[in-house]
């Protein structure tokens, strides 16, 4: 029986790729990629020419069985996403779950994920936190925010630049305008930026300065 490797890839800076990740990808019989075009750039940079197959949220229900069968037959499969660690607000959970159910060994390499550097650099308490990822866009959004109003741990969210100000404004309504927050964007890239302050202050900043790039919001928990 083969093995499934979950391989983190850089969230921005290609220098963040680990030696081990490169080796695993070069040795894999098959690489599952969220977007073969995006991953193709990374693989070309490191001269990795192994077979690659598309595996994303729109097709993973159909591809999982075939992948599991290939691993059972002895192949080594590596799973990557466009950026960061697969399964963290990215495709990956389904194939990992099916491998575990079928007694297949799963190894997740340590490596890049956007929320850890955003949390550590935020200046907010990081000994206890909860990761919420992307909030529901419509159904369930208010319910989710309501459930977090009494949360005392630091909270972490992912958001698109187009919805950032709207989401921060909603946070001010649910958590109070003076709640501390840190918004980190373009992590590890040339224009990386962290904007810290109260929700009121950070909303004002991004109202005047249109946000771009990938966004991580780190929100302080409710104080006693």
Specify the residue positions occupied by each region the protein language model found.
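Glycine-rich, flexible N-terminal cofactor/catalytic loop recognition
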Residues: 1-57
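Glycine/small-residue-rich loop that forms an oxyanion/phosphate-binding "nest" at active or ligand-binding sites
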Residues: 56, 64-113
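A contiguous loop/helix-start segment that scaffolds small-molecule binding in enzyme catalytic cores
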Residues: 154, 158-224
């Amino acid at each position: 029986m083969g093995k499934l490797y979950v391989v983190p890839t850089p969230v921005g800076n290609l220098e963040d790729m680990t030696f081990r990740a490169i080796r695993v990808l070069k040795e894999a019989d098959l690489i599952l990629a969220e977007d073969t075009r995006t991953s193709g750039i990374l693989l070309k940079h490191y001269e990795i020419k192994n077979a690659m197959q598309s595996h994303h949220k729109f097709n993973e229900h159909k591809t999982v069985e075939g992948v599991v069968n290939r691993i059972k037959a002895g192949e080594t499969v590596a799973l990557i996403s466009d950026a960061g660690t697969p399964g963290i607000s990215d495709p990956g959970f389904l194939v990992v779950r099916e491998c575990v159910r079928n007694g297949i060994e799963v190894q997740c390499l340590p490596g890049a994920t956007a929320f850890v550097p955003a949390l550590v650099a935020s200046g907010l308490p990081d000994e206890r936190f909860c990761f919420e990822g992307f909030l529901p866009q419509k159904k369930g959004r208010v319910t989710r925010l309501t459930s977090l109003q009494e949360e005392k741990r630091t909270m972490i969210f992912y958001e698109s630049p187009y919805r950032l100000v709207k989401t921060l404004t909603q946070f001010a309504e649910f958590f109070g305008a003076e709640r501390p927050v840190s918004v980190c964007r373009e992590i590890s890239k040339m224009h990386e930026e962290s904007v810290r302050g109260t929700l009121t202050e950070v909303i004002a900043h991004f109202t005047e300065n249109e946000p771009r790039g990938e966004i991580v919001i780190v929100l302080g928990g409710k104080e006693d």
